[in-house]
């Protein structure tokens, strides 16, 4: 079975999407619609050279979403997924590309998500750290022993877990994890503790927007971050999406489940090749590629 997977925040780069805009009338239309929907010219930032402007959460998230979704659209009849998944933000790209959400509704939700997350980060300064070379259980136990908020946020692949929490909590966790034998426990240059209870204000704000959005039947199952299982019911998808901002991204479990369900090849749709690399850590022989024009 063929899967298409969609990257999350961090995959952005200056000039992203310009080739799509220049190559396709459909892409042009979608980018113009995006500028109208967002109320600012995101194409100027995406197609420009200013990496700092692109790093703002309110820009980064819609930019990655647009790159992924428009690339899938430009593929036309070649885009025939039998299963889809997206890492964190990428789940929204996957939902639009598989037909569960309209392009405009998906973009509005992503924009609302980005703004709400930005606000939550400003209200409650916090951070994340990547932990390499320890069993999940060891990391989970150490996190649970710390009195401040520290939780597993992204299960990226075996031996790579990102934790999320208060600045002081992450500081303590990194020290304890290094003592426990982690190959690395490094703070990440992110704006806040994504996928942790500290994102509750953003989750509540996004929930209201999700509630009034129409979700439809899709063309194939989506493997969602909070369950790591194949789901096709629009109402169930909606409920899982509401939990996503404060729950762990179960990406390792998602990859393992897709493979168990008959995955034979995976194509990454959007900027970067991070997800292909993670799949290779689970199954070196798996056929993987990037979607191209």
Locations of regions flagged by a protein language model:
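Charged catalytic carboxylate motif
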Residues: 26, 67, 169, 205, ...
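Non-catalytic positions within long, well-ordered alpha-helices that form the structural scaffold/packing
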Residues: 76, 178, 259-262
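A short, acidic, amphipathic alpha-helical segment used as a generic capping/interface helix at domain edges
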Residues: 248-263
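FabD-like malonyl-/acyl-CoA
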Residues: 1-138, 184, 188, 265-293
């Amino acid at each position: 079975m063929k899967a298409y997977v969609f990257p999350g925040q961090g995959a952005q780069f200056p000039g992203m999407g310009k080739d799509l805009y220049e190559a396709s009338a459909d892409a042009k239309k979608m980018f113009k619609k995006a500028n109208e929907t967002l109320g600012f010219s995101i194409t100027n930032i995406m197609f420009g050279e200013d990496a700092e402007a692109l790093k703002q959460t309110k820009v980064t998230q819609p930019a990655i979403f647009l790159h992924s979704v428009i690339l899938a659209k430009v593929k036309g009849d070649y885009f025939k997924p039998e299963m889809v998944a997206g890492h964190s933000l990428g789940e929204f790209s996957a939902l639009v590309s598989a037909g569960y959400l309209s392009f405009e509704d998906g973009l509005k939700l992503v924009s609302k998500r980005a703004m709400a997350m930005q606000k939550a980060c400003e209200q409650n300064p916090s951070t994340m750290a990547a932990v390499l070379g320890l069993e999940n259980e060891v990391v989970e136990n150490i996190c649970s022993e710390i009195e401040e908020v520290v939780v597993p946020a992204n299960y990226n692949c075996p031996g790579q877990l990102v934790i999320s929490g208060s600045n002081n909590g992450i500081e303590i966790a990194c020290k304890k994890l290094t003592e426990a034998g982690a190959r690395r426990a490094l703070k990440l240059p992110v704006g806040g503790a994504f996928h942790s209870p500290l994102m509750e204000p953003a989750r509540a704000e996004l929930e209201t927007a999700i509630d009034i959005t129409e979700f439809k039947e899709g063309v194939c199952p989506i493997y969602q971050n909070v369950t790591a299982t194949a789901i096709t019911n629009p109402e169930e998808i909606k409920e899982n999406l509401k939990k996503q901002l404060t729950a762990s991204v179960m990406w390792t479990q998602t990859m393992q489940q897709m493979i168990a369900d008959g995955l034979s090849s995976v194509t990454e749709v959007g900027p970067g090749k991070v997800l292909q690399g993670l799949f290779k850590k689970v199954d070196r022989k798996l056929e993987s590629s990037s979607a191209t024009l």
